[in-house]
Design a protein with these regions (language model features):
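Charged, amphipathic alpha-helical coiled-coil/dimerization segments
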Residues: 4, 42, 92-158
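Flexible interhelical turns and helix-capping residues at alpha-helix boundaries
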Residues: 38, 69, 80, 84, ...
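DNA-binding alpha-helical recognition surfaces that contact promoter or target DNA
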Residues: 89
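N-terminal leader segment of winged-helix/HTH proteins
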Residues: 1-52, 180-181
């Protein structure tokens, strides 16, 4: 069964409600809000990246390499779900401009291990800083109303990930000693 077939089969709509159990356009509103939230969440770092001639793909690579030093090319491809050709283009930019360095694996010399340089770590920190401010503001706004915004947001975002992928995401996050709690 394909992912689409499984997803369709799992959705049991209640008469008068959509697949999210909402009335009318409420689920459309939620989906639309996710689009707008994503637009603004990535828009802040996009402006910084443009100053370097970089784009979102560069940001994604920096984000994971700075958090998981020694990440292999294969691991990064698995995380980002992009083609090797796309990754090579982005890595070439980041390596040539001194933001990432690659080293040969000690156990397997065919492996290329990725590390951020100080400049790469600084750029990644700048990008994270603007995104953290946006998330912190949103959580603070919600916490005033609910008191549990961070936990709710964490659980919601984890639930948005495909069920068969959640454990892999939690394992990856555990490498930073954060985990999925």
């Amino acid at each position: 069964m394909t992912r689409e077939q499984v997803t369709t089969a799992e959705i049991a709509e209640v008469p008068g409600q959509d697949a999210l159990g909402m009335q009318g356009a409420a689920s459309d509103d939620l989906i639309e809000l996710l689009f707008f939230a994503y637009r603004d969440f990535v828009g802040d770092p996009d402006r910084i990246l443009a100053e370097y001639g970089f784009g979102r793909a560069h940001h994604r690579v920096l984000h994971f390499v700075v958090r998981y030093p020694g990440l292999t090319i294969a691991e990064l491809l698995d995380i980002l779900r992009i083609t090797k050709q796309s990754l090579n283009r982005v890595l070439k930019d980041l390596i040539e401009q001194g933001y990432i360095e690659q080293k040969t694996g000690t156990n397997d010399r065919r492996q290329r291990l990725l590390f951020c340089t100080n400049a790469g770590a600084d750029l990644a920190a700048d990008l994270t800083r603007v995104q953290t401010r946006r998330v912190a503001r949103a959580l603070a706004d919600r916490a005033e109303q609910t008191g549990t915004a961070a936990t709710s947001a964490h659980d919601f975002l984890l639930a948005m990930i495909e069920p068969d992928e959640r454990a892999a995401v939690c394992r990856l996050m555990a490498r930073r000693a954060r985990g999925c709690a």
